[in-house]
Regions:
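Short, small-residue-biased leader/transition segments that mark boundaries at the very start
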Residues: 1-2
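Aromatic (often tryptophan-rich) hydrophobic motifs at membrane interfaces
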Residues: 7-9, 14-76
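Terminal substrate-recognition subdomain of acyl/acetyltransferases
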Residues: 58-110
């Protein structure tokens, strides 16, 4: 089990961040905050892409909402969650985020 912090920075410092727990191929988002408009969205899009490429099979956001549904979030029933979680924690996965992957122009309001 690893506790992870994923962050988006701009010229003024931290723009958005998420504290998470990684267990095998399961990623559990615990807390997310943003200081700049849309920075949290950039974090989610980049993180989901990195999780997919790293072999993660479950990203538990804890609570679905219409905003997260725009990014592909879907609810699954308790039985499906249990099966997916049991498989995910036994699988290896890795997260490789590239520093400086996006320029601030990609998300800063114009």
């Amino acid at each position: 089990m690893l506790f992870r912090s994923v962050e988006v920075h701009d010229a003024e410092g931290l723009a958005a961040g998420m504290v998470s727990i990684a267990i095998g191929a399961c990623w559990i988002g615990e807390s997310m905050a943003h200081r700049r408009p849309q920075a949290g969205n950039v974090l989610l899009v980049e993180l989901v892409e990195a999780l997919r490429h790293g072999g993660f099979v479950l990203f538990d956001v804890q609570l679905s909402n219409p905003h997260l549904a725009r990014f592909g979030c879907l609810e699954i029933d308790e039985a499906a969650y249990g099966r997916t979680l049991a498989q995910a924690v036994c699988r290896p996965a890795s997260l490789r985020l590239q520093e400086g992957h996006l320029s601030s122009e990609a998300w800063m309001p114009q």
